[in-house]
Design a protein with these regions (language model features):
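Acidic, glycine-rich flexible loop segments
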Residues: 89-105
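N-terminal glycine/threonine-rich, aromatic-flanked beta-hairpin/loop signature
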Residues: 39-80, 108-113
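Short, hydrophobic/aromatic-rich segments at coil-to-beta transitions
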Residues: 23-35, 49-52, 79-88, 108
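Tryptophan-anchored aromatic micro-motifs
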Residues: 21-42, 125-143
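Boundary at the C-terminal end of the N-terminal hydrophobic targeting segment
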Residues: 17-19
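Positively charged n-region of N-terminal signal peptides that target proteins for export
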Residues: 1-7
């Protein structure tokens, strides 16, 4: 009985250790355009743990004169380790954005302090985005 209990706990601990093994994100998994509501994030793996990021963010709402929107943008390079990238936009180093790559072609984006990102009233990058186009995205600077 002691042996069976010992084996059970050993297997339980090994299983817990395996489930905590960090997931490495490959370039094909990362590359693409991700969408959430009307917002888009473009990601390109550059190698050496770097990602090129472009965010086109939209907060749509209805006003007395009809539909309108506030917008925000951010671009630059992020550093990725395992399945999590940290992004400070080129023009705003006080805005820390975390991008976590999830299973099912999704990313979860969080902002450390939304007000410091200065995207515009009610505009945020936060949310769970789904990959809407795989492969190398076209960035605004490339056009």
């Amino acid at each position: 009985m002691k042996f069976a209990v010992s084996v059970f706990f050993t297997l339980l601990l090994c299983g817990a250790a395996l489930s905590q093994t960090p997931r490495i994100v490959t370039a094909p998994q990362a590359n693409g355009t991700y969408g959430y509501r009307q917002s888009e994030i473009k990601i390109l793996a550059l190698g050496h743990n770097k990602l090129r990021i472009q965010m086109d963010l939209i907060f749509a709402y209805k006003s007395p004169v009809g539909p309108t929107a506030n917008t925000g943008e951010a671009s630059g390079e992020a550093t990725i380790e395992n399945d999590t990238a940290i992004f400070y936009p080129t023009d705003n180093h006080s805005c820390k954005i975390t991008i976590k790559f999830l299973a099912g072609n999704k990313i979860k984006v969080t902002e450390e302090d939304t007000i410091n990102c200065g995207f515009g009233m009610n505009v945020t990058s936060a949310g769970t985005y789904t990959k809407i186009k795989a492969g190398k995205p076209k960035f605004d600077e490339d056009r």
